[in-house]
């Protein structure tokens, strides 16, 4: 079983896809890593030798920030924006879109589900 940065790569997938299970590594970066280390992208994770896994692990740890380190770095950047009082930091704190999107309609991904507010009940009709 291939384990890199505390993440078990899925055994039945190709190495090229398996590496994308690491936070911070997408398909392009995965292909780049495999080209640099000389590992065949079509190999299944279960068929990797210990030497290949060690080579991949060493290359990734030396050249990229992934998993916990990357998450911590992102959180620190967001916290820095909030601490210095920027508009972007305020939007992060409020849980609203940060990059200028409209919020009168849409923006539901960032804001979450609608919370319905009970309206006034209609007064009974007079006869």
Curated annotation (Swiss-Prot):
Keywords noted in UniProt: Ribonucleoprotein, Ribosomal protein, RNA-binding, rRNA-binding, tRNA-binding
Pfam families xrefs: Ribosomal_S13 (PF00416)
InterPro entries, per the entry: Rbsml_uS13_C, Ribosomal_uS13, Ribosomal_uS13-like_H2TH, Ribosomal_uS13_bac-type, Ribosomal_uS13_CS
GO biological-process terms attached to the record: translation
UniProt cross-references to SUPFAM superfamilies, sorted A to Z: S13-like H2TH domain (SSF46946)
GO function terms (MF aspect): rRNA binding; structural constituent of ribosome; tRNA binding
Family statement drawn from the similarity comment of this UniProt entry: Belongs to the universal ribosomal protein uS13 family.
Protein name per Swiss-Prot or TrEMBL: Small ribosomal subunit protein uS13
């Amino acid at each position: 079983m291939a384990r890199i940065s505390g993440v078990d790569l899925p055994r039945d997938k190709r190495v090229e896809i398996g590496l994308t299970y690491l936070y911070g590594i997408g398909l392009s970066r995965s292909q780049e890593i495999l080209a640099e280390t000389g590992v065949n992208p079509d190999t299944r994770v279960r068929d990797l030798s210990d030497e290949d896994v060690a080579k991949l692990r060493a290359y990734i740890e030396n050249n990229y920030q992934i998993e916990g380190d990357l998450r911590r770095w992102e959180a620190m950047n967001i916290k820095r924006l909030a601490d210095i009082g920027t508009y972007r930091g305020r939007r992060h704190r409020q849980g609203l879109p940060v990059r200028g999107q409209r919020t009168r309609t849409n923006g539901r991904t960032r804001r979450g589900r609608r919370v319905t507010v009970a309206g006034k009940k209609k007064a009974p009709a007079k006869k």
